[in-house]
Amino acid sequence: MQVKETVADGLKREFEVNVPAADIDAQVDARLVDLKDKVKLNGFRPGKVPVSHLKRVYGRSVAAETIDKLVRETNDGIFAERGFRLATEPKITMPQDQKVVEDILAGKSDLNYTVAIEVVPTIELADFKSFSVEKPVVEVSDSDVDDAIKRIAEANRAYADKAEGAKAESGDRVTISFKGSIEGVPFDGGTGEDIPVVIGSNSFIPGFEDQLIGIAVGETRTIKVTFPTNYASETLAGKPAEFETTATKVEAPQDTTIDDEFAKTLGMESLDKLKEAAKARLAAEYAGATRLRVKRQLLDRLDETHKFDAPPSLVEQEFAVMWQSINAEMQQNGKSFADEDTTEEAAREEYRKIADRRVRLGLVLSEIGEKNKIQVTDDEVSRAVIERARQMPGREKEVWDFYRSNAEALAQLRAPIYEDKVVDFILELATVTEKPVTREELYKDDDDKTAA
């Protein structure tokens, strides 16, 4: 066998490979000998079929199988000998001329093929002990807890029927039945019976709730609205519609007394227990935001200290996924690049930079994990699946079966766990300094940086 490197351009490599016909023929014969005791042919006793006869009957198919195996093993040897880690699957170019192919299968000609690859660059890892990270810390204050309790009370406030003939005001809850039409023609999903809506909640089409102000029980109104251009249904988006709407109930919001009795309506023993639960939830929320801030700093530091050319094919794949998502989102929201004060060309350039960063950081994190034997256990993956299942009550078995039968989905679930474990490993080595901040500072937008 002969191997000749013909391309060595950056991370791209290409090889011309020659496999002698004699090598192929020898492996075909070995395979036929192995099959001799397993094949049953009329006129021959088990195990007594001559190899020459087997070759006439099965030679072509066995040769094809052998060549496929030889190519895979040869390629693996080429890559292993040179210490290559592949960024993508190798591109193999086999002979296309039918006569040449037949001669190769018949053992009359050598096999000549080319294999092109893109390799992962050698990554020199930084000294993580030199990293410094600032950890923003927010203490959950009594006022934070009180505000959270007020929001809970607002979301769970009671309503009571208004006096007979009373008209609806902003903040009231009106129960309505309606029939919608466009140019006099009813449309799918345009009817509703006894639907409660709080005026001012902005839960209906823009302009709909405002036209309920002043309506009384038993009154019917024609409400005219225009569906937003970014409405989920393309058949309705941007179109004017009319809704014949009848109010069946008008209720006013009641003041909520925040006390033990209110807490009990939420399943808590007392107001103190409700406050404890609210404080714990806020603490978890702040901890999550803190984690994101710390991780952002760490990824930025990894980006700064690991500059190398990322495999172009991986960058292109990442960019393609991002670009498809961006375009779908813009189309759904009815926006253009001009609306975002940019051009398509500028946006492409910016997102290609982001794609390059993501690929490089992914390779760096993978290298760190590999060199430090960081692994995701089956138990950790199982816990992640269970958590996903909990988010879909009543469909737990469906979620479990989906991940059990979908290796790609399971890999997507495993990836962020692996990334977090690598991040935790680096944080153990880095210098982490806590900095007290306000809630507003913790959640302040950081538009000048892009997370991986």
From Swiss-Prot:
<comment type="function">
    <text>Involved in protein export. Acts as a chaperone by maintaining the newly synthesized protein in an open conformation. Functions as a peptidyl-prolyl cis-trans isomerase.</text>
</comment>
<dbReference type="InterPro" id="IPR001179">
    <property type="entry name" value="PPIase_FKBP_dom"/>
</dbReference>
<dbReference type="Pfam" id="PF05697">
    <property type="entry name" value="Trigger_N"/>
</dbReference>
<dbReference type="GO" id="GO:0044183">
    <property type="term" value="F:protein folding chaperone"/>
</dbReference>
<keyword id="KW-0132">Cell division</keyword>
<dbReference type="GO" id="GO:0061077">
    <property type="term" value="P:chaperone-mediated protein folding"/>
</dbReference>
<dbReference type="InterPro" id="IPR046357">
    <property type="entry name" value="PPIase_dom_sf"/>
</dbReference>
<dbReference type="InterPro" id="IPR027304">
    <property type="entry name" value="Trigger_fact/SurA_dom_sf"/>
</dbReference>
<dbReference type="Pfam" id="PF00254">
    <property type="entry name" value="FKBP_C"/>
</dbReference>
<dbReference type="GO" id="GO:0051083">
    <property type="term" value="P:'de novo' cotranslational protein folding"/>
</dbReference>
<dbReference type="GO" id="GO:0003755">
    <property type="term" value="F:peptidyl-prolyl cis-trans isomerase activity"/>
</dbReference>
<dbReference type="InterPro" id="IPR008880">
    <property type="entry name" value="Trigger_fac_C"/>
</dbReference>
<dbReference type="GO" id="GO:0051301">
    <property type="term" value="P:cell division"/>
</dbReference>
<keyword id="KW-0143">Chaperone</keyword>
<dbReference type="InterPro" id="IPR036611">
    <property type="entry name" value="Trigger_fac_ribosome-bd_sf"/>
</dbReference>
<dbReference type="InterPro" id="IPR037041">
    <property type="entry name" value="Trigger_fac_C_sf"/>
</dbReference>
<comment type="similarity">
    <text>Belongs to the FKBP-type PPIase family. Tig subfamily.</text>
</comment>
<keyword id="KW-0963">Cytoplasm</keyword>
<feature type="domain" description="PPIase FKBP-type">
    <location>
        <begin position="171"/>
        <end position="256"/>
    </location>
</feature>
<dbReference type="Pfam" id="PF05698">
    <property type="entry name" value="Trigger_C"/>
</dbReference>
<dbReference type="GO" id="GO:0043335">
    <property type="term" value="P:protein unfolding"/>
</dbReference>
<protein>
    <recommendedName>
        <fullName>Trigger factor</fullName>
        <ecNumber>5.2.1.8</ecNumber>
    </recommendedName>
</protein>
<keyword id="KW-0131">Cell cycle</keyword>
<dbReference type="GO" id="GO:0043022">
    <property type="term" value="F:ribosome binding"/>
</dbReference>
<keyword id="KW-0697">Rotamase</keyword>
<dbReference type="GO" id="GO:0015031">
    <property type="term" value="P:protein transport"/>
</dbReference>
<dbReference type="InterPro" id="IPR005215">
    <property type="entry name" value="Trig_fac"/>
</dbReference>
<keyword id="KW-0413">Isomerase</keyword>
<dbReference type="InterPro" id="IPR008881">
    <property type="entry name" value="Trigger_fac_ribosome-bd_bac"/>
</dbReference>
<dbReference type="GO" id="GO:0005737">
    <property type="term" value="C:cytoplasm"/>
</dbReference>
